[in-house]
Curated annotation (Swiss-Prot):
Protein name as catalogued: CMRF35-like molecule 9
Disulfide bonds listed in the record: 37-104
Feature: compositional bias, Polar residues: 139-152
Topological domain ranges for the Cytoplasmic compartment: 192-255
Residues carrying a glycan: 93, 125, 131-132, 138, 142, 146-149, 152-153
Residue intervals annotated with topology Extracellular: 18-170
Gene for this chain: CD300LG
Record's signal peptide: 1-17
Length: 255
């Protein structure tokens, strides 16, 4: 059981403290918005990307655009700045179809480091084509800076309440692994129990057969002993006279 707990800790604890609500950015149709994501020093040489978050239970990427590339007909670009440990995502000519959740991530071995971002797009108006969105909504060019001294995953900066969301697979993977290990352990224990029970039943059956053979042998010896006299000779059985006849002895007449 102890190895299972250790494995569970290795899978869950590294990203457990980063599971919080996503940050929202917004803009009007036709606007250009940008956001910046920071990363730790050890992730400087890793590839950065921007993608649309898909999947209901397990998060996955669609329409991925890597650093130095342009996607969606040039409307999306990702520019990495290793000197400042941050990369910038620029979204041009927004449309209502662009609304949804996105991932700002860094490729690495195992699980990627990602930040979930919700993009809101409002219908454009002729009165203020490039004005700020309604009150209560974050500005289009919001910086999503995140640094951490305890973990390499994205965390909110001190000047912003941006929060980070880790893909649901980070939570489901340890659960599935633990369930698989518990199932394997249970099946092994059940198989061992059934094997021992079968051996005990087989041993009891063999013992019962031996007892029957031994008892039958003793009964045969007792029957044989009843036919012998104390000297070991066979004792003839007494013959009973036939009904209506006298014993079959020779008759002698006196002289």
């Amino acid at each position: 059981m102890r190895p299972l707990l250790m494995l569970w800790g290795c899978l869950v604890l590294p990203g457990y403290g980063s599971v919080v609500n996503p940050k929202e950015i917004s803009g009007f149709e036709g606007d250009t918005v940008s956001l910046q994501c920071t990363y730790e020093e050890e992730l400087k040489k890793h590839q950065k990307y921007w993608c649309r978050e898909a999947g209901l239970f397990i998060s996955r990427c669609t329409g991925t655009v890597f650093s130095g590339e342009y996607g969606q007909e040039g409307r999306v670009s990702v520019h990495d700045n290793p000197r400042e440990n941050r990369f910038t995502v620029i979204l041009r000519n927004l449309t209502l179809k662009d609304r949804g959740k996105y991932l700002c991530g860094v490729k690495r071995l195992g699980f990627d480091k990602t930040m979930s971002v919700s993009l809101l797009v409002f219908p454009g108006t002729s009165l203020h084509p490039a004005t700020s969105p309604p009150a209560g909504i974050s500005q289009p060019a919001t910086q999503l800076d995140s640094t951490s001294t305890e973990d390499t995953s994205f965390v909110p900066s001190s000047s912003s309440k941006s929060r980070v969301s880790i893909p649901l697979i980070r939570i489901l993977a340890p659960v599935l692994v633990l369930l698989a290990l518990l199932l394997a352990t249970g099946l092994a224990a059940l198989g061992n129990y059934m094997f021992q029970r079968r051996e005990k039943a087989q041993l009891a059956s063999e013992t019962q057969k031996k007892d029957k053979v031994h008892l039958s042998h003793l009964t045969s010896e007792d029957d044989e002993a009843s036919w012998r006299d104390p000297k070991g000779d066979m004792t003839p059985a007494s013959t009973l006279p036939m009904s209506g006849d006298e014993p079959g002895f020779s008759k002698f007449s006196s002289v």
